[in-house]
Design a protein with these regions (language model features):
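Bacterial N-terminal signal peptides
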Residues: 1-10
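N-terminal capping segment at the start of a domain
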Residues: 18-56, 66, 111-112, 192, ...
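Soluble non-cytosolic domains of exported or imported proteins
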Residues: 26-33, 46-57, 121-129, 164-168, ...
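A non-catalytic alpha/beta surface segment that caps or lines the substrate-entry region
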Residues: 34-94
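Structural recognition of the beta-strand scaffold that forms the well-ordered cores
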Residues: 72, 90, 103-107, 148-151, ...
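Active-site-adjacent substrate-binding region
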Residues: 78, 188, 197-303
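Proline/glycine-enriched tight loop/beta-turn segments at coil->beta junctions
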Residues: 96-103
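Acidic/histidine-rich catalytic neighborhood of metal-dependent amide-processing enzymes
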Residues: 114-219, 223-227, 235-240
Length: 303
């Protein structure tokens, strides 16, 4: 396989010219880890907090550096804590004038649980950070589809997840895109959640689009990462659900076993929604596995 790749590159590139680097090979896991550490160091990141504002500033800074078209979906959510200002941030790459151009969305939330002392190194920081590394990889890359990087806000429930509490940002944006007709152009939606876990194991989420999951499995197999994907199943309420309800093919790329499992712990592991969700639980290797696999999947779907 390596020899064939080198042969193809030799024929594709003029003498002395470097072969173009693929999207998935442009992913920098060291930078993704550094972004994760930086966001986690901001501390608590519930909407309105200093850490939340610093995270927003970092997202805007990176997107502007990488040449994205930056948009915000801002609104006031009615929550059990009262009105909360919410801002989804979207970085768009390779936008053409063709109104029929397909869209692919890579998403993750950047808020944290309303819990004093909770920094969410994995649950919030890792997903926000890997999207920043995706922005760096996409800078200068050409794709047929528009690629949207979406940072959702107020994913976490105030009390407990139900139809009215939790997923505030994704519910609002999905409803907006369905109402204005954009949802029909979305080729797919990948949500990344808690993907920095040192003991990485991405679940096969049973409500997600099986065809898109199969593309992810193919990409993982090609890269030698199959052992990290779809070895167990789970049904979960997450930011992909409002998009599924809007008719968008969506997959939750989630590690749903964070730490030890058992009756003494949270249903998603001992570190989930725990103040022990800190940087020592996050791995650069896990970010590399997920980042390269997801970007290779996007390349496959863009052909």
């Amino acid at each position: 396989m390596l020899a064939l790749g080198l042969l193809a590159a030799a024929f594709a590139s003029p003498a002395g010219a470097a072969a173009p680097v693929s999207l998935h090979d442009s992913f920098n896991s060291q930078q993704a880890y550094a972004y994760t550490a930086r966001i986690a160091a901001f501390g608590e990141r519930w909407p309105g907090s200093p850490g939340h504002r610093k995270t927003e500033e970092l997202i805007y800074q990176v997107l502007q550096k990488d040449g994205a078209r930056v948009e915000a979906d801002s609104f006031t959510a009615s929550t059990p804590r009262g009105p909360v200002a919410v801002r989804n941030i979207i970085g768009k790459f390779n936008v053409s004038a063709d109104a029929r151009q397909k869209i692919f969305i890579l998403a993750g939330h950047y808020d944290t649980l309303f819990q004093p002392g909770f920094i969410g190194a994995n649950d919030g920081a890792s997903s926000a950070a890997i999207l920043l590394a995706f922005a760096d990889a996409l800078a200068g890359q050409k794709t047929r589809m528009q690629i949207w990087l979406l940072w959702t806000d107020l994913e976490e429930a105030i009390h407990s997840f139900d139809n009215d509490d939790g997923l505030y940002g994704s519910r609002h944006l999905a409803q907006t895109l369905a109402a204005n007709g954009t949802a029909s152009r979305i080729r797919g939606f990948f949500l990344l959640d808690m993907i920095g876990d040192k003991d990485l194991g991405v679940a096969r989420e049973t409500g997600s689009d099986r065809g898109l999951q199969d593309f992810i499995a193919r990409a993982a197999r090609q890269l030698g990462y199959s052992q990290y994907f779809f070895q167990y199943e789970i049904d979960i309420i997450d930011d992909h659900v409002p998009f599924i309800r809007a008719g968008v093919p969506a997959v939750d790329v989630v590690d749903a076993m964070y730490g030890r499992m058992g009756p003494s712990f949270d249903s998603m592991g001992e570190f989930h929604h725990s103040n022990a969700d800190t940087m020592d639980k996050v791995s650069q290797h896990s970010l590399e596995v997920v980042g390269r696999t997801i970007l290779l999947t996007v390349e496959m779907l863009d052909r």
